[in-house]
Design a protein with these regions (language model features):
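The feature captures the beta-strand-to-loop junction immediately N-terminal to the Walker
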Residues: 12-14
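Helix-to-loop junction immediately C-terminal to a conserved catalytic motif
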Residues: 27
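Conserved "ABC signature" C-loop
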Residues: 51-99, 122, 195
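ABC-fold ATPase nucleotide-binding domain signature/coupling loops
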Residues: 54, 84-113, 131, 206-211
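A short, proline-enriched helix->beta-strand linker immediately N-terminal to the Walker B motif
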Residues: 102, 120-124, 153
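Catalytic Walker B motif of ABC-type/P-loop ATPase nucleotide-binding domains
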Residues: 126-130
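C-terminal portion of ABC ATPase nucleotide-binding domains
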Residues: 145, 167-211
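Conserved catalytic loops of ABC-family nucleotide-binding domains
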Residues: 149-158, 166
Length: 211
């Protein structure tokens, strides 16, 4: 499979299908035992669901690994987009859960901050593994909508178990037992009686039952 520049991809599958393993292969954290991965990108960044919080300021956290000299205005703009406006006045406040002087944020707020760091990244390829796991469905939809605008010229791979969140992606990759079994846009995959359609219908039925 080839990732094309400027396209947005979704990677889905049940738990244990191999999504996170594939992510770590793409980031060169694992080495393939068979086959090859050809990497033509100069800069990559990733946001995993188990992101870390470090004893640094909000500004330092947002610009971690970012060599560009971003203005406070740009940082504030992204924080506004992700409903983190309350942090704009405290960019130099220590961000940590380990000290009394730190800024105490909820898990959802911390996840928004981690997403903001990805939004500010200058990388060519951005991988996001369950980036909205701590957000409600409405907030999740908004994050994916914003990502289409912010990542216009970048290649992105969103890994999620919530299929509704990736229905607007350019292409969706479906893993099953460690194998890429289907790929295509949402409409194409729904026309097939395959893994994706069954997963999507199951999730839709579960959502209706909860309502």
């Amino acid at each position: 499979f080839t990732f094309e520049k400027g396209k947005h991809y979704g990677l889905v599958g049940v738990n244990g299908a191999g999504k996170t393993t594939l992510a770590k292969l793409l980031l060169d954290l694992y080495k393939p035992t068979n086959g090859r991965i050809y990497d033509g990108t100069e800069k990559k960044t990733a946001l995993f669901q188990d992101f870390q919080v470090y004893p640094v300021t909000v500004r330092e956290y947002l610009l971690m690994g970012n060599d560009s000299n971003l203005s406070n205005a740009r940082v504030s703009e992204v924080l506004d987009m992700l409903e983190c406006s309350n942090l704009k006045q405290g960019l130099d406040t220590p961000l940590t859960l380990l000290t009394e002087e730190g800024t105490l944020l909820s898990k959802g707020q911390l996840q928004r901050l981690a997403i903001a760091r990805a939004f500010l990244s200058e990388a060519d390829f951005i991988l996001l593994d369950e980036p909205t796991a701590s957000l409600d469905p409405i907030s999740e939809r908004e994050v994916y909508r914003l990502s289409e605008h912010i990542f216009q010229e970048k290649t992105t791979l969103f890994i999620t178990h919530r299929l509704g969140a990736v229905s607007q992606m350019d292409e969706i990759l479906v893993l099953d037992h460690g194998q890429l079994v289907e790929h295509g846009c949402h409409e194409e995959l729904m026309r097939k009686n395959g893994v994706y359609r069954k997963l999507y219908q199951t999730q839709t039925e579960m959502y209706v039952d909860e309502i």
